[in-house]
Amino acid sequence: MRSLICDSPPAIVRPPTTAARNEGRVIEMRSVNKPGGNYLPVIIHSGIAYVSGQLPRRGEDLLYAGKVGANVDIAAAQEAAALCADLCIAAINHAAGGEDRIVQVLQLVGYIASAPGFTQQSQVMNGASDRLIERLGERGRHARTSVGVAELPRGAPVELNMVAAVRE
């Protein structure tokens, strides 16, 4: 069994397929976010990549904050979820050597900071699922769980973690 542990992402990741579309604009994935604590951003073991939770941020800057159903609407939460999906792919790109090494996204788990009574977590997660299919085609189809929570780190509205099969 082979394990690859990625504990120090570079400042810039530039595989050939790092452009992501967001409402007609192209966003280039220039960096992999460093972890906010004593854990690894991704581990690849026996052809399976386990990506730690990703917040909608660039470096230290949180780009979305608040609770969905209170001060964050569904459209903004979907954008945040799409960004988190891009960051999951960027983490795998760094650890595995490129987006083309992703064989299949297996599972996506999304945590949505939800106002009391908000029950449309699955709608929020469609932003991430749509982004994965847009970028990876059929390789981006996955099993998914959407969980409403009271709070997330740094006040983020969305956090995603991913499991994917990768070519070693």
Segments predicted by a language model, with ranges:
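Short, polar/acidic, helix-capping and beta-turn segments at strand->helix junctions
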Residues: 14-168
